[in-house]
Amino acid sequence: MAKTSMVNRDIKRKKLAEKYAVKRAALKKIVSSQDATYEEKIEAATKLSKLPRDSSPSRHRSRCELSGRPRGVYSKFGLGRNKLREATMRGDVPGLRKASW
């Protein structure tokens, strides 16, 4: 089980990313625009750098919903590999079963 503080920190990062998503996308569009002047691009880049660091979506780490494990997470199910295996063996995941050939 992951530390509660790490899980909470990740939840906070996800909320911040959602909060600033529109503003961040608008500034990124200006920075990558061909039509914007050099001064506009520099201004947009400085505004982008002044946003909270944790508001970047790349700082969010996908975690297992049950255990909070940060690695080996299947995004389709939201579970780590160990918990996904346990759920599959119990028959909780429809259409998923152990491979046999």
Curated annotation (Swiss-Prot):
Keyword field contains S-adenosyl-L-methionine: no
InterPro entries, per the entry: Ribosomal_uS14, Ribosomal_uS14_bac/plastid
Chain residue ranges for the region called Disordered: 48-69
Pfam families assigned: Ribosomal_S14 (PF00253)
GO molecular function: rRNA binding; structural constituent of ribosome
Chain intervals with Basic and acidic residues compositional bias: 51-68
Keyword terms of this UniProt record: Ribonucleoprotein, Ribosomal protein, RNA-binding, rRNA-binding
Keyword presence, Ribonucleoprotein: yes
Subunit details: Part of the 30S ribosomal subunit. Contacts proteins S3 and S10.
Main function: Binds 16S rRNA, required for the assembly of 30S particles and may also be responsible for determining the conformation of the 16S rRNA at the A site.
Protein name: Small ribosomal subunit protein uS14
Organism: Stenotrophomonas maltophilia (strain R551-3)
Lineage of the organism: Bacteria, Pseudomonadati, Pseudomonadota, Gammaproteobacteria, Lysobacterales
